[in-house]
Amino acid sequence: ENINGQIPELLTTLYGNISMAGKIRLLDVILPKSFVRNFKGPKFGIEGVRRLLDIKDRPIICGMFKPCIGAPPKTLGKLFYEMALGGIDIIKDDELLADPKVSPVDARLEECLKAADKAFRETGRKVLYAINITDSPKAMYEKAIKAKRAGANCLMVNTYTVGFGALADLAEDPEIDIPLMTHPAMAGNFFLSPDYGISSSLILGKFPRLAGSDMIIYPSPYGKVPLVKERAVRISQELRSPFYQLKSTLPG
């Protein structure tokens, strides 16, 4: 009853001052239904994302712009078109590509939506563009609303730099009726130490799902930032297992 349905105070209660008290790790927490019912969670979940893409029985393929830093909107639009023709289902911004002067959010969105429409006319395949709107909470919310009204079909947030509360604000807004993707930048600060921090299954699994992330990117045992296989499996279980009324979150 002391935590009134918000993640910032939940984290403060579970791992606040005690995080500075020595070798202590938060491994897991069982949240009661009375607490979880305060959250709407993911709007779409795995099944909802599959419906948007009209993909029923195959893996969903996600790719990102490379190179991205310094690339103007028209260049990114061209890359988007080529990636869409190549079979990518979700094309995401790099976590470093937020709102630079050379490629602002509005212009980037316009070019990539045109590319998505062109690719759809040629292939009949839908592609989601997870545009990075990371900013201060107020500015990020304004960007989310503006992007949605401009036709955006997916949003990406560097959740561990803006906070779970800011993500939850987006997820719970009825006007922002498009999927939200969490990027893991800075998440390693929480889970990599064997002696301190918060387990990867909580920080990359249970908490972003509670906050309303429809999709989350996280390391795999085979990528450039390898994650122990058992941890990767545990994260996936947290994202997909029954969690009261909450929809699942797509692991990525």
What are these regions (language model features)?
Residues 1-40:
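Phosphate-/polyanion-interacting regions in eukaryotic proteins
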Residues 41-71, 117-126, 175-178, 182-191:
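N-terminal small/glycine-rich loop or linker at the start of catalytic domains
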Residues 59-77, 127-139, 187-201, 252:
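Active-site mouth loops of central-metabolism enzymes
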Residues 65-67, 95, 131-135, 157-159, ...:
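A cross-domain feature marking catalytic cores of carbohydrate-active enzymes
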Residues 83, 147:
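Conserved, mostly hydrophobic/aromatic
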Residues 88-109, 220-227:
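Glycine-rich, proline-tolerant flexible connector loops at the mouths of alpha/beta enzymes
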Residues 101-104, 113-117, 128, 135-140, ...:
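Catalytic cores of extracellular degradative/oxidative enzymes
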Residues 142-144, 150-252:
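Catalytic alpha/beta core domains of metabolic enzymes, predominantly
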